[in-house]
């Protein structure tokens, strides 16, 4: 009926008003897996030699960023969070979006080609440390089309990793354990100083949360 249609329209509109528009930018880069193994907290196993930076612009106003690595815990294959930042300053210049932190500068430039990330299928979610315990947050279901990006980044720690995307998406192939490194603290700085072997790929996607 017309009334039902109107109600449905009102409900949809109401939901839309409360939704947040998210521009999400994701970049993965290669890092020696033996060194990642030495950092991971108890109970986690490294899945691939990869570190990932996710950045977001929320409602065109607020920047946010997180730093993760591919890991498995209790048969859950996904990511574990190394660090998170809110209220991240960002700038836009045409198709280029740049996020700037005291620890990191990273920019994403859309190239107008649809694409995504090969590892997304193998992702139940991400573990975040809260009150001394790692809690799994299920992966968001994002159906919007993704656009490949060129990406450039540099960690600002002494000896921090840096890289520029090669214009193609590359897989992260698991590496055998060859060198055993001493256990190190699971910190942003310890992960950020592992050299970037290459930028594996980057994309951007806009959706409502």
Predicted regions and their residues:
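N-terminal domain-onset segments
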Residues: 1-64, 183, 191-193, 206-209
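Glycine-rich, compositionally biased intrinsically disordered regions
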Residues: 33-96, 101
